Amino acid sequence: MSASAESTNATPYGTLPPTAAASARKPISLPRLLEMHARGEKLTMLTAYDATFAAVADAAGVECILVGDSLGMVCQGLSSTMGVTLQAMCYHIESVARGLRRAQATAWLIGDLPYGSYHESREQALRSAAALMQAGSHMVKLEGGGWTADTVRFLVERGIPVCAHLGLTPQTVHALGGYRVQGKTQESAALMKRQAHELQDAGAALLVLEMVPAALAAELTRELTHCATIGIGAGKDTAGQVLVLHDMLGINLGKMPKFVRNFMTGAPGVKEAMQAYVAAVKNGSFPDNTQHAW
């Protein structure tokens, strides 16, 4: 490889811009993520549930690794995320954190608060969040709208960074009537906007938007001034993107979600597939609003 190729972090599937290459070499912190967002650089996130895949994702240039409660479906064989326990989350976060430390990785590690671990009270949420942080998380993620704002504020005031989650929230999929696009009507879009601003005002620094119309997600991304949006099935104009590891590697025995691209296609290995994902998000070729969004 030539010196110029090395300096721009070229991969077989695209070239990361110099800012992305620099970000991959330096430890990722929350201020750093928000600085990247402020200068217009797309953020990348993937799920990982074990030490090896987490280390490979970091080596591929992924800035944020999410130990999601999706592990219930892709690792434990559950039919939904609602059966995942706090103990299981801590186990997988510990595994991922060890892998990242061993690899001297730079990625920012986020852990999902599982169903039932933060619903009872702010104090319950603090105990659960503390368990995830002690397991190795840098940030916790929780699902829900305005009712979670008080909990978000309570955690942030105690030094725990929070990622919020609106749109399709898998922990409440039964109440939503299934895995459906959220925010399609004028009323539901207005509600989501209000909730997003409430969560930002409470201190949420990141906000996952799942299965949200691309136009609404773009509008929210423009409106939120100190909270970076991370899309999954929310179009290309969010501040960043996240996919479930197994989906983007094509490891799915069922129907692949519309918003997923199989990055293993044509890739010689897992790391190269992850590099292709990072490059595609950074250069704006993924997601494609005509194929992967509503």
Curated annotation (Swiss-Prot):
Gene Ontology, cellular component aspect: cytoplasm
Cofactor dependency: Mg(2+)
Active site: 210 (proton acceptor)
Cofactor: how bound: Binds 1 Mg(2+) ion per subunit.
Molecular function, one GO term: magnesium ion binding
UniProt keyword annotations, A-Z: Cytoplasm, Magnesium, Metal-binding, Pantothenate biosynthesis, Transferase
One Pfam family cited in the UniProt record for this chain: Pantoate_transf
UniProt record, GO biological process: pantothenate biosynthetic process
CDD domains: KPHMT-like
Residues binding 3-methyl-2-oxobutanoate: 69-70, 112, 141
Residue ranges, annotated region (Disordered): 1-21
Binding positions for Mg(2+) per the UniProt entry: 69, 112, 143
Keyword Magnesium in annotation: yes
EC number: 2.1.2.11
Pathway annotation: Cofactor biosynthesis; (R)-pantothenate biosynthesis; (R)-pantoate from 3-methyl-2-oxobutanoate: step 1/2
Polar residues: compositionally biased ranges: 1-12
Compartments where found: Cytoplasm
Catalytic activity: 3-methyl-2-oxobutanoate + (6R)-5,10-methylene-5,6,7,8-tetrahydrofolate + H2O = 2-dehydropantoate + (6S)-5,6,7,8-tetrahydrofolate
Top enzyme class: transferase
Superkingdom of the organism of origin: Bacteria
Family: Belongs to the PanB family.
Function: Catalyzes the reversible reaction in which hydroxymethyl group from 5,10-methylenetetrahydrofolate is transferred onto alpha-ketoisovalerate to form ketopantoate.
PANTHER family (UniProt xref): 3-METHYL-2-OXOBUTANOATE HYDROXYMETHYLTRANSFERASE (PTHR20881:SF0)
Subunit structure: Homodecamer; pentamer of dimers.
Protein name: 3-methyl-2-oxobutanoate hydroxymethyltransferase
Organism, as annotated: Albidiferax ferrireducens (strain ATCC BAA-621 / DSM 15236 / T118)
